[in-house]
Amino acid sequence: MAAIDEKEYTQSFDWKIWKRLGPFLRPYRGAFVSMLVFNGICALVDVVLPLFQKYAIQNFIEKNTLTGMLPYALAYLAVILVQALSVVIFARNSMHIEMNLGKDMRGSLFHHLQTLSFSFYNVTPVGYLLTRVMSDTNRISSMLAWNFTDILWAVFYVLGTFAAMLALNWRLALAVIAIVPVMAILTGYFQNRILHWNRKVRKLNSRITGAFNEGITGARTTKTLVTEEQTADAFRSLTRQMHDSGIRAARLNAVFIPLVLFFGTMAVSIVLLRGGYMVLDQALELATLSAFTAYAVSIFDPIQMTAANLAEFISLQASIERVTDLMDEQPQIQDTPEVIEKYGDAFHPKRENWEPLRGEIEFRDVTFRYPDGGENVLEHFSLHIPQGTTVAIVGETGAGKSTLINLACRFFEPTEGQILIDGVDYRQRSQLWLHSNIGYVLQNPHLFSGSVRENIRYGKLDATDEEVEAAARAVSADTVVSKLENGWDSDVGEGGDRLSTGEKQLISFARAVLADPRIFVLDEATSSIDTQTEQLIQNAIDHLLTNRTSFLVAHRLSTIRKADVILVVKDGHFVEQGKHEELLRRKGYYHDLYSKQFAQESAARILGDGSAQ
């Protein structure tokens, strides 16, 4: 994933990238047009206001009279009211665009993420996704709604001001306009460098988000391994880099802003000096000089702001690329158009066309290698699993026990060969059809924030409270509920962190019972669980295995002995298969594994029973 984080995005303007925003912007064309019109009105009013100042000096101050003041005041008030109304309308439109555009982009991204394959989440850090779904979409919607507004106002205002200055006195106007190219070059020079460091800050912010997420979710591990200092040092290193980049940008700004003020002051000085002589020579009216001074004071801020915003827009292009790259990410496992037409997809399932699943599975001459792997993990592997068979997969940690399960669940597909479900190649059926018939309980099951009842109901969203409680009783998960202060409505915490591993497994078993899958997959927990909970878990497993085709990544001797077929994995390859007694008689790798690991478990149990007595 480092390659993803370090990708260098296009730095020059690329219209093709911006066109990708078209589908998101199209619903808000009316709001954009309205924003454009009323923004133009605001800029026009800002251009006109110094002319009111000129009129007041000419007609009231120089003539020392208030004749005509009331119509003047009413006209001035009307212009201010028009400006205020325009600000309200374009601000509402900008807010409407920002909120809805951000909502649409986040919704579309989240919808797309639901379609991506299991393998994508295996290699993609959560921080990477959070940055794109939240930070990048917020930045895009905010800049299009507000920075774009600022650019429009600045362009309208600068053009209007130039026109007004030229109309008032073209010689004096040219003296001010001559400074503009110098300001433009200066702004371009500094903004490019400021933008470079701001980009670095954003890139580091993405890494910090990921590191922060890992630091919080892994806090227990950090504390138990006493690695707080190392974790904090690594986090501090990232924040220090971000701090240093931010300081560099701030230093450039500290030089740039005074230079802008200097040239702005120079423009005003030129107007006052040259204009003053022209007033003395009666070549220019004092009222006109007053208006000119107001224009000279105000014209350079919009120019500088426009340059800064344009630089930010080039930077924004990287955010658009990051979001669209994620949108372009394709599921590794995809149903064919014919399958989707018949069975539907994850968001539009055609359940009426789904055939009942019995649970007969056949691996037929399957060869498989992982997409990023060079060698085959399986070669010409064949196995017939009748309906209701329990298959235990054993092997040392890291041996590749999950490969067969990933293939059976269609998280990956065979490189060669076929996998048949009920006699039909599972690629001829939809993924949703298969996954809706699979109950998957992980070593450390994931529970969602919410109550125990809500977590069990994830197995069947329309289940009644009675069905939820019956499913829990079937696997003794009600014993967990009885210990909780608020019973079924107790909050399990984020990820279920208020429950022990054993309790989370029991809740997951209840969820699986409620879903009533025809295929059950269990990755047994390797962590130690108290004897009482372990017995409850074993009873729950026995209940779930009944009349279901089951795959068990097994660690307990009692589970393995009950299996109809044991598959033995070594270095990513299946080296033996058979029943427990048969494999022991062969005195092969399973026998060695049993002697080293499972005999120790038996001895530990005997010692435990003896001490208990």
What are these regions (language model features)?
Residues 62-71, 164-178, 248-321, 326-327:
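Helix-loop-helix
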Residues 17, 25, 90, 94-98, ...:
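Juxtamembrane loop-to-helix connectors within ABC transporter transmembrane domains
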Residues 343-613:
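ABC-type nucleotide-binding domain
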